[in-house]
Regions:
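Core RecA-like ATPase module of SF1/SF2 helicases and allied nucleic-acid translocases
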Residues: 1-146
Length: 146
């Protein structure tokens, strides 16, 4: 959180539940007046990777189109963008939905999480497996040096 809202953390028990929660949040954001082109979904995985909760997902028409890696178009058109964390490094968006998190402790995971979680200008929403709650709590404590 820099100048924006409090970070939202969302636990899930299955990829299906994660997908449902992500789509529900997108609907809520759209109903609150956030435009599709302000929303970026980040994942360690490509959307065509079975590890992504959006793999083979049918996206309801009220949510609109989700496009992959639309560089140079961050402020145009009316669609939600999907990037891998590595592809989005150095870029920013008003709203970031960070999905498909594998962990919080491993050095590679921590670096990937840092890159993803530092991309939001206003709102960051983080989706992680419920069994990672203890790791997330440790990460939070360590980041505050407690």
């Amino acid at each position: 959180k820099a100048d924006g809202e409090v970070v939202g953390y969302h636990k899930y028990d299955s990829k299906t539940a994660e997908k449902t929660d992500v789509l529900k949040l997108i609907r809520r954001l759209l109903s609150e007046g956030i435009s599709r082109n302000d929303i970026v979904i980040l994942s360690p995985y490509r959307m065509d990777n079975a590890n992504s909760c959006l793999y083979n997902a049918s996206i309801p028409s009220d949510i609109g189109e989700i496009r992959l890696n639309e560089f140079n178009k961050l402020d145009s058109d009316d669609f939600i963008r999907f990037y891998t964390v590595k592809a989005f490094k150095g870029l920013e968006a008003r709203v970031i939905l960070y999905i498909d998190i594998d962990g919080f402790e491993d050095d590679d995971e921590r670096l990937l999480n840092y890159v993803a979680m530092s991309r939001a200008r206003t709102l960051l929403e983080v989706f992680y497996r419920a069994d990672l709650e203890e790791e997330r709590q440790k990460m939070m404590l360590n980041s505050y040096n407690l």
